[in-house]
Structure formats: C-alpha cells, structure tokens
Swiss-Prot record:
It is a multi-pass membrane protein. NCBIfam families: mscL, PRK00567.1-4. One of its GO terms (cellular component) is plasma membrane. It comes from the Bacteria. GO terms for molecular function: mechanosensitive monoatomic ion channel activity. The keyword Transport applies. Homopentamer. Keywords: Cell inner membrane, Cell membrane, Ion channel, Ion transport, Membrane, Transmembrane, Transmembrane helix, Transport. Belongs to the MscL family. Channel that opens in response to stretch forces in the membrane lipid bilayer. May participate in the regulation of osmotic pressure changes within the cell. This is Large-conductance mechanosensitive channel. HAMAP family: MscL. Disulfide bonds: none annotated. The gene is mscL.
C-alpha cells in the first residue's frame, strides 16, 4: 500500500473529519466569544467599576520616549489578560453546559426500558416445540 493511499484512507476516516470540523467550529466560536466579552460583557462591568476598561489596564515599565519615536513603551498589559480569562470562563461554561446536556440526553436514553420482544406467533411456537422434541429424541 503506497503512502498516498494510506494517507487517503487516514483522511477518509470519520475521526479526522470530525476533528477538522470541531477545530473550525471552535475557531468560529472563539470569535463569537471574543466579540461577546469585548462588546457586551466588559462594558457593563467597566461601568459598574467606575468606567474602567480592562483592555486598557497595564503596568508601564518604561514609558514612551518622544525623543526616540522608534521605541514603544514597555508595559505589562494585565487588562488584556483579564479579558482573556473572562473569555475562557465563558467558553468553559458553554462547554460545561453542552456536556451536561449531552449527559442528560444519554441518561434518559439509558433509563428507557428496553423494548420487549413481541410474543412468538403460533407458527413460531409450533416450530420451537418441534425443535425441542427433535432434540429430546437425539439425546
């Protein structure tokens, strides 16, 4: 088997395609959560906290020097980190709720009583009796 045919078989498996779809949806979900945090969640939090915009929070280690415009300020931007942590918590909560929903659905499926087999028809009953008689004669 050539390497190309092995690769084609590997790609054609459902797991690889499912993983690719999951990564693409995850990337799109990341953009949605970023927009949600930056544009909807953080403005009210900043308003409650006296108009603080977390994305602008930083510890400036070395300020801009107007004499050397090529050098930017050096700062630890902990506000961006706070936004990222909030974004992570929202994603983690969404994934938790999704897993919880899937577990509830699986539990409901497991709790359903198994479907009972229908009673044998008279013809099947007769055939089983004949089978049993033949077994007894053989013994």
């Amino acid at each position: 088997m050539s390497i190309i045919s092995e690769f084609r078989e590997f790609i054609a498996r459902g797991n690889v395609i499912d993983l690719a779809v999951g990564v693409i949806i995850g990337a799109a979900f990341n953009d949605i959560v970023k927009a949600l945090v930056d544009n909807i969640v953080m403005p009210p939090i900043g308003l409650v906290l006296s108009g603080i915009d977390f994305s602008d929070l930083a510890w400036v280690l070395k300020p801009d020097d107007p004499a050397t415009p090529a050098l930017d300020a050096v700062a630890i931007q902990y506000g961006a980190f706070i936004n990222t942590c909030i974004r992570f918590l929202i994603v983690a909560w969404a994934v938790f709720m999704l897993v919880k929903l899937v577990n509830v659905i699986r539990r409901r499926e497991a709790e359903k009583p198994p479907e009972e087999k229908p009673a044998p028809t008279p013809q099947e009953t007769l055939l089983m009796e004949i089978r049993d008689l033949l077994k007894r004669r053989a013994d």
